[in-house]
Amino acid sequence: MNSKERVFAALNGDPHDRPPVCTPTSVATVEFMDLNNAYFPEANRDAELNASLAATAYTQLGFDTIAPYFSIIQESSALGCDMQWEQKDNWPTVRMTNPIWKNSNDIKIPKDCLSHQDTKTIIDSISILKKQYPDDVAIVGKTMGPWTLAYHVFGVEPFLLGTVDDPAETIKCLEKLKEITILFGQAQIDSGADILTLPDHATGDLVSGEYYKRFLLELHQELVEELSVPIILHICGNTIDRMPYIAETGMAAFHFDSRNDPDEAIRTVDGKIKLAGNINNPTTLYSKGPDAVKEEVFRALNAGVQLIAPECAIPLKTKMENLLAIPEAITDWVAERGNFDVFKS
């Protein structure tokens, strides 16, 4: 069984030889940038550099996925947001204190949205990776959800205030922004993406689970209908209160944060959606060593998490030995339990 087959078997609940280790977001690091001579910000904006850096998840770490969209800002750049590109040891960001739009009437998709350098880089990178690894490993695209796009184009505070002051207008905004999600997602599918990650940051730090149900549940169900590949929803933070709703979306999996107990998460989704995660980034992968990483992997596996992954895009200075500890831990866990080839999640 190869990596792509393993990932799809886990998502579909079919028998597979071991739990897959995946990256729904990013495992790009400064160490891998040095190894490939592919540095931020250029590796976010040049397809060849992007593909070279992304492939290290598979070629150097033995992960079962390759995810070339490292950040969360490519389509926002194409929409005209004010960008801060930073250097190799820092993430590019949108200057959300300088929003480009004020309301739903302002939302316009530029004609060059998909030919813009920062969206085209991802589309072309996926094509490169698909030619290099046609059926060996799962290629994971990424398209921002409408809630995340709203933060970028309206600013976080104005957008969240609008959800209280004028919920109907908020829904109009999200419906229009959803079209960007579909447009960029479909372009990646057409280029060869096997799976899409959908980051939509309606996190418990900012909004309640009822907000998710009110504003996003139906939209996310519509995205599942529109986009023809399995979708992995990603939301940072404490999300237990919205997991029952997320389980109703039809998404293939939910990529969840380490702030959620994996046992509780498994109980909460009640078998209605697969879970990916939830190895801690700042405390464990960045600050501790391989033994601590393996302990967290075992905890997630013992809980029944189907796809093991860092909780989010990893810190750029994460050490390779800690990332290598993730697939090593899975191998050890399976070895302790004997045959795994009849496993069905």
List each model region and its residues.
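Active-site loop segments of alpha/beta catalytic cores
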Residues: 3-26, 31, 64, 94, ...
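Segments that shape or occlude catalytic/ligand-binding pockets
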Residues: 32-72
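Short aromatic-enriched loop/helix-cap "lid" or pocket-rim segments at secondary-structure transitions
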Residues: 33-35, 79-81, 152-154
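Short, solvent-exposed coil/turn linker segments
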Residues: 34-40, 100-104, 261, 280
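An N-terminal domain-start capping segment
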Residues: 39-54, 101-112, 143-156
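Short, glycine/charge-rich beta-strand/loop segments that flank catalytic centers
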Residues: 68-78, 141-148
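A contiguous, low-structure linker/loop signature
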Residues: 71-112, 136
